[in-house]
Swiss-Prot record:
GO MF annotations, alphabetized: microtubule binding; RNA binding; ubiquitin binding
Protein name as annotated: mRNA export factor RAE1
UniProt KW keywords: Cell cycle, Cell division, Cytoplasm, Cytoskeleton, Host-virus interaction, Mitosis, Nucleus, Phosphoprotein, Repeat, Transport, WD repeat
Subcellular location: Cytoplasm; Nucleus; Cytoplasm, Cytoskeleton, Spindle pole; Nucleus envelope
Membrane spanning stretches: none
Similarity comment: family membership: Belongs to the WD repeat rae1 family.
Coiled-coil intervals, chain numbering: none
SMART domains: WD40
Keyword match Membrane: no
The organism of origin for this protein: Homo sapiens (Human)
Length: 368
């Protein structure tokens, strides 16, 4: 029996292969277009864990839906299943065994989607939209962590309707990341908190934000021993901070860099500055991708402090991105991110998810 049982997809399968996709201004990088993309802005993407054979991609959208595709080695995408919330879906994640998907929504709930039965049940409740959701697999417990605009961080045993633990946040949760045994939560008013997850979740440290503007996205990175050691934090001001938790030399090791800005440099040609909508670290090389409201993605080597690549400009913002478990596929979503308000929203504009074979482009530069 397949992972999805006998569930049917929600569209026709695509036929394009890696390297043979057509191009125009919506796809200047000639990347593979995922078939049957959502009908409204795409807020989150997540690939299946290495425990599952093959690659499955999940996307959540402002059309209140969560969709799943199988991504074949050829690059062909096959729609597999779909679930609904009653509000926009703001975040998605997988269980470590790949059997469940967890979804967070503006409807103030989080759900657990069992892929084999294609059934989704509510597992969490907040007093405001749920902005982030992460699965935590510890030696002595497993739970789902939800962060909300109600200024709480809640931890849920999926078998109970009451949270295992509730931690108060200084402000609304804007973004978060988890790599056991570390969690990072960034809030409104530039709040930044690191949690340790061993034994049970607890606050480890509050950090003064290295960025002067609103937090937009955060991603934890690992050291050469595969342990979480710091994070990258992106803001609406076209800037990313690289921050180590316990660096030997904080003043030297922690730094920020500008990105997702136009080429203007002076008063005669002012620079346009765009939000960093997403950050993802390559699972093998430790290099990173950023995507922005300027409609570009960029690849970076944080250790060499160099840019590896910047894409051509798409005709709308890139709202989310992720790598598959071995780093061979880079997925990014092209859709309106609401950075210019409702008056710039065009409901006729199609939303896209693209897949790029980026294994070579993310390799670190050879040290001279």
């Amino acid at each position: 029996m397949s992972l999805f049982g006998t569930t049917s997809g929600f569209g026709t399968s695509g036929t394009s292969m890696f390297g043979s996709a057509t191009t125009d201004n919506h796809n200047p990088m000639k990347d593979i277009e995922v078939t049957s993309s959502p009908d409204d802005s795409i807020g989150c993407l997540s690939f299946s864990p290495p425990t599952l054979p093959g690659n499955f991609l999940i996307a959540g959208s402002w059309a209140n839906d969560v969709r799943c595709w199988e991504v074949q080695d050829s690059g062909q995408t096959i729609p597999k299943a779909q679930q609904m919330h009653t509000g926009p879906v703001l975040d998605v994640c997988w269980s470590d065994d790949g059997s469940k998907v967890f979804t967070a929504s503006c409807d103030k709930t989080a759900k657990m989607w069992d892929l084999s039965s294609n059934q989704a049940i509510q597992i969490a409740q907040h007093d405001a939209p749920v902005k982030t959701i992460h699965w935590i697999k510890a030696p002595n417990y497993s739970c789902v962590m939800t962060g909300s605009w109600d200024k709480t961080l809640k931890f849920w045993d999926t078998r109970s309707s009451n949270p295992m633990m509730v931690l108060q946040l200084p402000e609304r949760c804007y973004c978060a990341d988890v790599i056991y045994p570390m969690a990072v939560v960034a809030t409104a008013e530039r709040g930044l908190i690191v949690y340790q997850l061993e034994n049970q979740p607890s606050e480890f440290r509050r950090i003064e934000s290295p960025l002067k503007h609103q937090h937009r996205c955060v991603a934890i990175f690992k050291d050469k021993q595969n342990k979480p050691t710091g994070f990258a934090l992106g803001s609406i001001e076209g800037r990313v901070a690289i921050h180590y938790i316990n660096p030997p030399n904080p003043a030297k090791d922690n730094f920020t860099f500008k990105c997702h800005r136009s080429n203007g440099t002076n008063t005669s040609a002012p620079q346009d500055i765009y939000a960093v909508n997403g950050i993802a670290f390559h699972p093998v090389h430790g290099t990173l991708a950023t995507v922005g409201s300027d409609g570009r993605f960029s690849f970076w080597d944080k250790d060499a402090r160099t840019k590896l690549k910047t894409s051509e400009q798409l005709d709308q913002p890139i709202s989310a991105c992720c790598f598959n478990h071995n780093g061979n596929i880079f997925a990014y979503a092209s859709s309106y991110d609401w950075s210019k308000g409702h008056e710039f929203y065009n409901p006729q504009k199609k939303n896209y998810i693209f897949l790029r074979n980026a294994a070579e482009e993310l390799k670190p530069r050879n040290k001279k």
